Amino acid sequence: MDEDIFKNMTASFFNPEIQGCLSAVQSITGYQLSAVDRQPFLYFHNYLTNPEPEFVSAWRADPALETWYHKFSNGVLMDLQNTLACVSYHYERLVAIETEVIESIEKFDYRKVLGNSTIALGNTLVWDFEYQAFILAYRRCLDYLARAICTYFKNDFHSFRRLGTYLKKLKPESIAKPLIVLHEKYRPMFEFVLSEGDRKSLRDQISHYGYVQAGTINLSQRGFMLAGGGEELGFSHASGAIALSEVLNRHMANLKSCVREMVYQYVDAIRAAQVTSR
């Protein structure tokens, strides 16, 4: 690029008017994971660039293999990272909706009117929309994780549900085995988005079969409760949770822990295998 053109482009970029545009867009459309949630991705990026691994350099230098470099790097740093951010965004929206609904309802003395009765309130569509988006993004994040992991083996595979079985077929075992162990650890935590046999997951129910609600608002002397819905909320919920946010918080913690452990293990196993092969 001509030096004068580069200088003009740089000057334009740092012009207050352009910076103002960037700031405006960021404030409206931008989203960023927390510093803690970015750590596994920074760990992967550091491995990828400081210094660049020999096998990555070989991929980039070979036109027939270069596509695997892009899949390897973008699979973690773009596909997985951005989709984890998507899940986190929908989770935060769901928590905000719950908080706003409860705060608004508690401004009214409904307990005095209801006595010993319970009343159900309708039209929670916005809540439903965000819940469905959360579930779909959650499953997508897991499948992107599976796909990212398989790129090192130069394989296109995208099912987190079947990842453990698939990894058993791949070499080197020193990389695949610890990932299989982690998959076995976390898979039971994700049954709500992973179908098995005749059991349909929430993700499949939403995608293929029918409308799934976040729940139905119930008001009584006990106060506000979101009942039923995809998480089958109620006082008898298996986890003991009585609020949607409690259940979703557990889902988020499990997903973040899975991504963190698997990315760290992925990098460490690859690094060790590359050292051994020298």
Predicted regions and their residues:
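Acidic, Ser/Thr/Gly/Pro-rich intrinsically disordered interaction regions
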Residues: 1-96, 110-135, 146-278
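Mixed-charge, low-complexity intrinsically disordered segments
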Residues: 101-104, 108-113
